[in-house]
């Protein structure tokens, strides 16, 4: 598998469009083909890291830059984590990709006729294309957490925990992606010996865009931690209410158990045991004790769940303000 692209009229075109006479500006190779053209040990060592790299990076090897770009899983281009190698010089960009991430990006750049002037400009445009939908994705994730927060505040502890964890994992993947890509963009923006001044400015602008996305991501991660903490607090409140009910039930049953156990011993000459109305008196005593305990617990507010009490207090506060 090999794809060749050229820059003509400041746009990217496929080599099949009448530009076969000139050397290609962009090459897409698989790992076996790239290993065949790797002329130095440093490049071969970098290519060996491609299958298991987790963070984007770039290194300067002679008169070119070599690195790996790692896109998080779940991107629109691939459901799995996408990786591709980069070999960049002033006159050529070689992309090492065993999948279709690079060919998809390059095809979209050519279809949209995105302005590019050099191989480094093509790489920068590809990275921007990877980031195109991230602002909208971060907005959707924030809307998800706002919905989770609203459900929790309404007292609904049964929310979609799977969706919450999926959003948290997505944010974690974006964090790693932004860190690595920001370092890569910073390194290339400062390499004036390899890149043209216009390309250095493009990568500097890309680095600033990543900084803005990183700050937005950081605030969103803080918000997600608050929602997770609120969710855990609601679980704790629910557990405390269950334990409160169990304590109340056990407290009500304790004197009744004592009375029934006392009369169950069947000792001679026990109070009320030999009179015809004794059973009725004992039953009435048990009912009176149970009612007295229920009234006592109700006045203390122990027979209401905490969330319900808070709701009633909020309603009373609203009525008072009215």
Regions found by a protein language model. Name each.
Residues 211-322:
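Hydrophobic alpha-helical transmembrane segments and their immediately adjacent juxtamembrane loops
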Residues 113-116, 184-204, 221-236:
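Hydrophobic alpha-helical transmembrane segments
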Residues 199-202, 206-207, 213, 244:
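A beta-strand-loop signature enriched in Asp, Gly, Thr, and Trp
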Residues 157-160, 199, 206, 239:
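The cytosolic transmitter module of two-component sensor histidine kinases
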Residues 69-73, 192, 231, 266-269:
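Short, well-ordered turn and helix-capping elements at secondary-structure junctions
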Residues 1-190, 196, 212, 302-308, ...:
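Peripheral, non-transmembrane regulatory/ligand-interaction domains of membrane transport proteins
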Residues 121, 158, 165, 200, ...:
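General secondary-structure edge motif
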């Amino acid at each position: 598998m090999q794809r060749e692209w050229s820059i003509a009229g400041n746009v990217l075109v496929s080599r099949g469009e009448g530009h076969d006479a000139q050397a290609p500006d962009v090459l897409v190779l698989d790992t076996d083909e790239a290993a065949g053209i790797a002329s130095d040990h440093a490049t071969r060592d970098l290519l060996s890291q491609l299958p298991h790299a987790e963070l984007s990076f770039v290194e300067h090897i002679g008169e070119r830059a070599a690195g790996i770009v790692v896109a998080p899983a779940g991107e629109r281009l691939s459901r799995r984590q996408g990786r591709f190698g980069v070999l960049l010089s002033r006159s050529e960009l070689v992309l090492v990709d065993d999948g279709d991430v690079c060919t998809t990006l390059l095809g979209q750049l050519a279809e949209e006729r995105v302005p590019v002037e050099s191989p480094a400009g093509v790489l920068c445009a590809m990275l921007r294309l990877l980031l195109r939908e991230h602002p909208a994705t971060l907005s959707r994730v924030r809307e998800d957490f706002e919905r989770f927060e609203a459900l929790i505040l309404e007292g609904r502890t049964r929310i979609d925990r799977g969706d919450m964890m999926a959003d948290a994992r997505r944010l974690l993947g974006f964090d790693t992606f932004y860190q690595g890509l920001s370092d890569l963009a910073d390194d290339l923006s400062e390499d004036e010996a390899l890149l043209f001044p216009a390309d250095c400015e493009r990568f500097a602008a890309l680095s600033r865009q990543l900084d803005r996305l990183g700050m937005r991501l950081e605030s969103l991660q803080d918000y997600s931690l608050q929602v997770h903490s609120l969710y855990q607090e609601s679980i704790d409140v629910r557990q405390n209410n269950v334990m409160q009910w169990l304590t109340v039930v056990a407290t009500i049953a304790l004197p009744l158990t004592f009375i029934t156990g006392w009369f169950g011993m069947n000792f001679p000459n026990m109070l009320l045991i030999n009179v015809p109305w004794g059973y009725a008196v004992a039953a009435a005593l048990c009912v009176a004790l149970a009612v007295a305990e229920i009234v006592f617990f109700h006045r203390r507010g122990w027979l209401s769940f905490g969330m319900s009490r808070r709701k009633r207090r909020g309603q009373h506060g609203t009525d008072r303000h009215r």
